[in-house]
A protein has these predicted regions:
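Conserved S-adenosyl-L-methionine
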Residues: 1-95, 112-113, 119
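C-terminal catalytic and target-recognition region of SAM-dependent MTase-like enzymes
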Residues: 91-176
Length: 176
């Protein structure tokens, strides 16, 4: 919904495809004398073999900011998942559940990050209107705002405490 730089979208694709973290990177430890180069080569080959090339993942990200959409696309290309990730400029008000099943995970901008508190609360109200309960769909929203449920208009089915960097947040999950 708010793809930003695409972190959640890209990490979801990497997970769905079973692409090992750091697979496309080189590490200085690969040059250590204590570990034969063949060990690194074999492990990278094994990780490549474990990729689920037939996975049916299709991630879609939306953002009202065209620059964020461009950044998401660029980052998906760098991560090697552009084939299963789409990003487009779209207002949250235009969100529709167009498929039988789906998962929305978002970390919307909030007062401490990008918007003032009033703007963030207005955004939460809009989200509550467009993220309607639908069989086969779930919505997970990360925010530090303790008034989120009140603004969203529904109590979460489940909540989890987490930190987004140094910011104490809640993960509000809606799946019923």
């Amino acid at each position: 919904s708010f793809c930003g730089s695409g972190t959640v979208l890209i990490e979801s694709a990497l997970y769905a495809l079973n692409i090992a973290p750091g697979l496309r990177r080189n590490f200085s430890a690969e040059n250590w004398d204590q570990i034969d180069a063949s060990v690194w080569r074999k492990e990278k080959e094994r990780a490549q073999d474990l990729i689920r090339r037939d996975a049916r993942f299709q991630g879609r990200g939306f953002d009202i900011d065209g620059a964020a959409v461009s950044l998401t696309i660029a980052n998906a290309k760098k991560a090697g998942v552009i084939g299963c990730v789409q990003a487009e400029k779209r207002d949250i008000r235009d969100f529709k559940t167009e498929t039988e099943t789906g998962v929305v995970i978002c970390n919307p901008p909030y007062g401490e990050r990008l918007l003032d508190i009033k703007q963030a609360e207005e955004l939460y109200q809009i989200m509550g209107q467009v993220f309607q309960p639908k069989h086969g769909w779930s919505y997970s929203i990360i925010t530090p705002d303790e008034m989120f449920e009140q603004c969203y208009g529904r109590k979460a089915d489940k909540r989890r405490k987490l930190y987004n960097g140094m910011i104490k947040c809640q993960l509000y999950m809606y799946f019923k």
